[in-house]
Amino acid sequence: MNYQAMMKVLVSEAVRIATFPFRILPIRKNRILFTGLTGGRNYDYSCNPKYLYEYMRDHFPGQYEYVWAVSDCEKYRFLEEEGVKLIRHFAVSSFPMLLTSKVIVTNGSYAPWFPFRKKQYVINTWHGGGAYKKVENGRPDADWATKKRAEFCAHNIDLFVASCKIQEKEMIQKTFCYKGEVVRAGTPRNDRLVNGDIGDMARKVRSHYHIPEDGKVVLYAPTYRNPSEPVVFDSDLILSRLQSGVCSGLLAEHQNDTGKWYFMCRFHRYQEPDGPIRVKGEHILNVADYPDMQELLCAADVLITDYSSCVWDYGFLNKPCFLYVPDKQEYMKLTGFYVNVNEWPFGQAQTMQQLVDLLCTYNADEQKEAFHQHLERLGSYETGESCKQIAAYICKNCN
């Protein structure tokens, strides 16, 4: 039995009773509340809600009242300069704001645990594109409490945002048992990636970490998991091979560059520092606390991950992407995939030497074509206008 999930079910019922007195407060038709789940109990100014908010702010100035529910209000005081009201995620003091906002935009499991009112409008953008690893309640070992949590989620949501056809069918409708309206808009955080508007995002990251203009970045971003055997990534080996020039074909536009390579590592927030996913090496930039994964992707010249949905986002940049998956068979058995990992359009390695070989034999045209076919197979809904489409739903429900 997943006791944590069971406790959340019980807590949600308790909250439903505790918030009853607040229901006499009128709903503010122009109030929009955003919240972005970033892992565990962390809620930040991030992910799809962030990009949707910025679109609304820029295209509808002065028309709406914006609220952000975050874990640490002090981190985001700059939003108050834009007129945003900050509330602490799930603090009792936040309940009146939660129950009087006309539209609530979340990217994950915020919605299931709060008894929103029937006249409120809850949008779930989700926090991953494509259709890759199965979500918790869709896995073979999912228990009653975990599945019950998914039912709460489906019941509370009025509009679910889908990035592709397979995600809509297999995750949204099948795993979550969601029967409501789906907007086939793609993901707000990918609009700029799809449109190629990434220059300032990349420069922001490079400036933050003092990476020179001719510097090149490889980003390692493993997803959360607990394999039976440690997964150890040798960053020094990768950097030495890249710096030596033996993989000169990896970045065609940099073939004659002599700039230094930098290794960035971003662990999932669930992953313990001394856990089974490890990186060894002397020159590692830990970017786990950087607030925006999309900006990191824009700054990276090469991405190495495993089962993360960031491959969907990064694919639109037409840059080299590889999967380091020494625990692939175990992960397939314990977690599973909506689309078999062996059919993903990126080179896969189960040893460090295999990864080096992939780096040195990379063919940009082949990966670009493979990703294009992948988008067709999954039925991509990404057009670069996700924010515009979802904003139309928000405006309609706020008027």
Regions found by a protein language model. Name each.
Residues 104-126, 130-133, 289-334:
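A donor-sugar binding/catalytic signature common to diverse glycosyltransferases
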Residues 1-2, 198, 352-399:
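C-terminal amphipathic helix plus adjacent low-complexity
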